[in-house]
Amino acid sequence: MTQEKTRFSFFPLAVAGALALLTLPAAAELVAKLPQVMDPFFITIADGRMYIVESDVSAHIFTLGPQGVAFVKTFGREGQGPGEFDFIYTIRPFKDHLEVLGNTKLARFSLDGEYAGEVTFTFSAFKGAVYRLGDGYVARDLNFDEKGMATTLRLYDRDNRLVKEIGARSSSEGLNKINLVSDYYAARVAGDTLYVIEASRDKPVAVTVYDRTGVEQKTIVLPLEPVKMTPALREAVIKPLKDTWSRSSPTPWAEYEKRLFFPDRAPGLDYFEVSDGKFIARTWKYRGDQVEFAAFDLQGRELWRKDLPFTGRLSNGTLFCFYQGRYFYLRENPAEEVWELHAEKIL
């Protein structure tokens, strides 16, 4: 389906100059100030390089090392040509290249941000939810209207032809009944393995494992139970959205709030990744300005649970990542009108 941009800017910032260099932290603390960053949407770190997507169509590269953090370059631009984007949703680092996901293309760049080619996809995918799997792709699509919502996971070959439908889920919650803690149904790929994650308000989180051809192998149930909806949780979910509403939508907040629907329970998670041989999930359990994360091995055995700084949900992207046993996250410093990189040790 066609997607609209749902980003918003936190504040206009026009800062030039060198990046402040700070040593990497041993515990939770400021790592660096990032004057190059104005409107971040996504962050990831791999092999000593940090990539931050911002302003819809570009990304910054920084290096992280014993001497601190240093700005390298910015790559990407708006357009429809080679190496150009109408929107960048995510960057996936691999051993020798980057995959950069847009609305209808998957572009390849070197680890240093040099363009190296791209493929376009003609199938429908919601907000860049496309992964390479074997010689083809797996895509998640989301369609919704006033009456309800439908999510599908499909496998395609290298020529964009449908191979099979992995699964589909639907609900009666649509544009007139907006559920901010909706069920979670998504795909992740690591190597030649497809993981389909399902979390609902009725049962624990399940991860179903498929091979590269879409043949089901097994299902792993994670000890992440649905969370009771309380007035405090409801307020925690609404507040970040309400606080930024006037900057992100022309619709009056009171009108939008009338359409909100909160079930009696939230699903066991709202974020999931497969990273460094682990499952990592973010739950709906808030404690002050922190939220619970949990990690599991690939057999579903729990490795750790920890409350970590909350960076927002919904349209403001993913402003955190895990790297070398630390939780790195971006935080706005309004007083200095600058974005900062912080980190907290996990164990």
Can you say where each PLM-predicted feature lies in the sequence?
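Eukaryotic scaffold repeat domains enriched in small/polar residues
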Residues: 26-347
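Compositionally biased, low-complexity segments enriched in small residues
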Residues: 1-2, 19
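Bacterial N-terminal signal peptides
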Residues: 12-23
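Bacterial N-terminal signal peptides that target proteins for export
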Residues: 2-14
